């Protein structure tokens, strides 16, 4: 989606999730910053970018364009021009003053420092909030990390709990405990966006098992949509009440198309599936 947007922030997209969940237009996985840790993610968003490196890349592309063979030249020119535009925008942003932002880049999984408990998901959401507030990115991706089971007192990680929660009540209770934590983090994030007067201009999409034993379905996945100026409806049941086991009456692909519409991207389908939820959400 970000490739359809005019770049109005330092980066068009920032992927800090811990899974392969983002792909580019060529179906290649977008590398994540997650493994770099919070300090380097913060430096990526709020650190100085050497302009000489970008200028050298621009110069190299210009030199390579001049040396293109006449045969099939047109097939390469468009790609070179796209890279030049991207680098020129990157250079423009690199020359702008970087906002001075205070942020604790250390992980505090237990409150040994008197500064409160901070786990990776809370930290990532706070990085996203600051990134939005100070125009460091337009599209952000994060995901609840592989949790430290000892900190939460559960016997499995979140993903494993989603597979086992239907087996016995105690395992379901563990998944519920984790999801209450994740949704608590999300609630605080939304509250902070609202305080910053950013929520109405920020589309927030959050998915998970939501303590449903029937999780891991790509078609029927509990999904929370917040902000973005939508006409929010509360709970929207996607199954057809007259035929619960039949095709869904509202699909995730339709939701994605409506989100793209709200972002100003005029598309009528997502992944080959047509339709939208505009009549419900806008």
Predicted regions and their residues:
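Ligand-binding pockets and gating/stacking loops
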Residues: 1-282
